[in-house]
Each structure stands twice: as C-alpha cells, then as structure tokens.
Design a protein with these regions (language model features):
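Substrate-binding strand-loop-helix patch
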Residues: 29-30, 54-65, 85-103, 152
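A hydrophobic C-terminal alpha-helical subdomain
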Residues: 117-136
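NAD(P)-dependent short-chain dehydrogenase/reductase
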Residues: 9-56, 62-63, 69-70
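Mid/C-terminal beta-alpha module of Rossmann-like enzyme folds, strongest
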Residues: 74-122
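Active-site helix of classical SDR
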Residues: 3
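Catalytic phosphate/metal-binding cores of nucleic-acid and nucleotide-processing enzymes, i.e., regions
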Residues: 63, 69, 77-81, 158
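Amphipathic terminal alpha-helices
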Residues: 146-161
Length: 161
C-alpha cells in the first residue's frame, strides 16, 4: 500500500496528465490468481479452509480493461485523477471461493476460518471495498456485479481447458 501510494504521488508531482486506476482482488483466465487457484484446489481436495474475515470486491481484469479502453476511446483521459475500480457488490474470500467452487462444478467442502489461522508477513486489511462513486460520476459507466463477471471468467476457463 505505501509503495503504491508513493508511486501515485510521484506521478502527481511530475505535473503530467494522468489517470490512475486502483483495483483489488484482480483475476482473469490468465496468470496466477485466486480464481484459478481455487478452481484447482476445489477440484483436487475434499475439504478446504478459506478466510471469511477479509471483505472486498473481486475485479475481473477484462472489466477493468474495458473501462480503461472506454475512457481512452471516449477521449475522456483529460479527467485526470485517481479512480477506484472493482466489480459491484462485496464478499469475503470464503464467499468468493464457494462461488468459484460451485460455478466450476466441484464438490469440495469449503469451511470458513479466521485470517490469524494463516500467519503472513504481509498485513492484509479486513475491509478493502473500493468506493467507485468518483469513477461512475466522471465517466458515466455501469460496473458489472462480481458474480456475473465471475461466471464469464469461469466459462472462458472451461472453454479453454
């Protein structure tokens, strides 16, 4: 968080036109991410524990790319600033994992657990829901609900496997 903010401040100090999009819980059908990991784990395991006390909003990379494209294509990049983007709605990692498992057609028993059961050097916020009001007002965009976007991603993963 601190290094990201320092980077944003450096860009702002330069004095150029800029658009910064903050996001969270990013996933797609490419690379390593929570969705792909959970699909694999819930296919391979009978039981799994996932934290329920960290709340946020997943972000489908395709939706983020679409918003950025529309802003640039619509010649709106002069509206410089820092904007938040994630899909609509909120969930815990546990809720997200359960939905991934169900949409993938897996039957793993997913149990909720506390974050402190998974010690980490990186401190994770318990509530990381982004306020997208500024983005919506500036660019007049509608943002898809996280479950709808997850369905699209899972379907693309199924098609490519």
């Amino acid at each position: 968080g601190k290094t990201k903010r320092a980077g944003e401040q450096s860009i702002q100090r330069v004095g150029c036109n800029y658009l910064i999009f903050r996001t969270a819980w990013l996933y797609s059908q490419f690379g390593k991410n929570f969705v792909k990991t959970m699909r694999q784990l819930t296919a391979d395991k009978d039981k799994l524990r996932v934290v329920f006390d960290q709340i946020g909003t997943p972000t489908y990379a395709k939706d983020l790319a679409d918003i950025i494209y529309r802003v640039i294509e619509g010649d709106q990049y002069h509206k410089q600033g820092i904007y938040h983007f994630s899909n609509e709605g909120v969930c815990s990692w546990y809720d997200f994992a359960k939905e991934i498992c169900e949409l993938s057609g897996n039957s793993c028993d997913i149990q909720p657990c506390h974050s402190d059961e998974f010690p980490s050097k990186v401190k994770r916020p318990h509530f990381s829901v982004l306020d997208k009001t500024k983005l919506k007002l500036a660019f007049g965009v509608e943002i898809p609900y996280w479950k709808d976007s997850l369905v699209k991603c899972i379907n693309e993963l199924k098609e490519n496997n």
